[in-house]
């Protein structure tokens, strides 16, 4: 999550344009999605511990190299390397936890795992935003952030490598315990089920309307003439909202049902995006950012619940989640490129107007989809 923030400061420092950020983020999403497809083979070949070494090594190289960047495309190349590692990490971790967790406990384990990730992102992302806006001894803050993040990732890589050399890959491959080989890609026949198809379409529209809110908001704030130092305040507010949203919306599903929670969240998101575009005062933007974080990331567990509610075969979960994730990831390949050109040709405000409109349309597949089966 720190990449879009750092990239926005690099755009300003190098005199580049918003569309350059869109190209970089689109390429990163494309290669990250493709890298994620190779997670299973990577884990089987190298084992879980060595796979983590490769992932953290990609983080370290990507950030450390950008400490010395002199142009936006150099920065983009090495950020793509870091984000490819990010694309592999969650698939490898989820696979590892799924294989080694009882089905009845899987939801709790994965929920705790994602919550821990959010706890880490909140202070780290805010730290990156605050520090990147300053300079120290003539060194831009974003270079210092890249150096710190790169050093930490490289140290973790060396520790994991030392652990593997000393103990071997005690965790083994996260996929080695499966009895039958499975295809890397889920079958397209999943879309024959109307409920599955409507949920996947809703997921695509949800991703279009919400996944790039964080990435392009620095440009929106710049367009409003705000001090770059407020980016850190926004980052903190938005990530706190994301953490709260995952927990709050997940619990509301048990009370009101996943359909009602999703529809309400998307309509609220549309209204909040309209407020964000028109707001001028920092307090209003901060409050709106928190609420946007809640309804943006809160819809992710809601859609996952909606997707599997009518499914009785636990073996189908892997294919359903993989297809849903791939569909959303494919959307994220295109949206940064589209939004970057919109921001350059018109202004960042038009991006958020488009997001608000699509957020309303995301309700339709869920509203008119087949009623949930028992």
Predicted features and spans:
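Helix-loop boundary and gating motifs at the non-cytosolic
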Residues: 1-22, 29, 198, 202, ...
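Residue-level signature of mid-helix packing/kink "hotspots" within the transmembrane helices
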Residues: 1, 29-37, 122, 239-243, ...
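Structural signature of the two symmetry-related core transmembrane helices
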Residues: 50-64, 260-274
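Cytoplasmic helix-loop-helix junction between adjacent transmembrane helices
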Residues: 80-117
């Amino acid at each position: 999550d720190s990449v879009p923030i750092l990239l926005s400061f690099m755009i300003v420092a190098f005199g580049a344009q918003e569309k350059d950020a869109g190209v970089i983020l689109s390429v990163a999403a494309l290669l990250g999605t493709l890298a994620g497809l190779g997670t299973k083979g990577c884990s089987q070949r190298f084992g879980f511990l060595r796979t983590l070494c490769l992932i953290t090594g990609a983080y370290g190289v990507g950030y450390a190299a950008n400490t010395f960047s002199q142009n936006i495309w150099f920065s983009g190349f090495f950020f793509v390397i870091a984000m490819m590692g990010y694309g592999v990490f969650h698939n490898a971790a989820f696979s590892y936890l799924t294989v080694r967790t009882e089905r009845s406990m899987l939801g709790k384990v994965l929920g705790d795992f994602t919550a821990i990730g959010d706890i880490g992102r909140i202070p780290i992302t805010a730290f990156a935003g605050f520090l990147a806006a300053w300079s120290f001894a003539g060194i831009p803050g974003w270079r210092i952030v890249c150096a710190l993040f790169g050093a930490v990732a490289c140290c973790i890589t060396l520790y994991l490598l030392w652990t593997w050399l000393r103990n071997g890959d005690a965790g083994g491959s996260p996929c080695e315990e499966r009895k039958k080989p499975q295809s890397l890609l889920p079958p397209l026949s999943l879309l024959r089920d109307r409920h599955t198809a409507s949920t996947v379409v809703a997921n695509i529209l949800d991703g279009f309307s919400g996944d790039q809110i964080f990435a392009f908001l620095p440009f929106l704030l710049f367009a409003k003439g705000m001090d770059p130092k407020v980016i850190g305040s926004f980052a903190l507010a938005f990530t706190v909202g994301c953490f709260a949203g995952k927990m709050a919306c997940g619990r509301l599903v048990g009370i009101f049902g996943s359909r009602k929670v999703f529809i309400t969240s998307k309509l609220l998101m549309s209204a909040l995006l309209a407020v964000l575009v028109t707001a001028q005062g920092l307090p209003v933007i901060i409050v709106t950012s928190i609420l946007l974080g809640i309804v943006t990331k809160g819809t992710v567990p809601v859609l996952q619940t909606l997707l599997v509610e009518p499914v009785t075969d636990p073996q189908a979960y892997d294919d359903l989640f993989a297809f849903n994730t791939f569909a959303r990831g494919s959307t994220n390949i295109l949206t940064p490129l589209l939004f970057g050109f919109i921001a350059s040709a018109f202004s960042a405000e038009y991006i958020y107007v488009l997001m608000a409109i699509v957020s309303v349309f995301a309700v339709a597949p869920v509203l008119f989809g087949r009623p949930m089966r028992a």
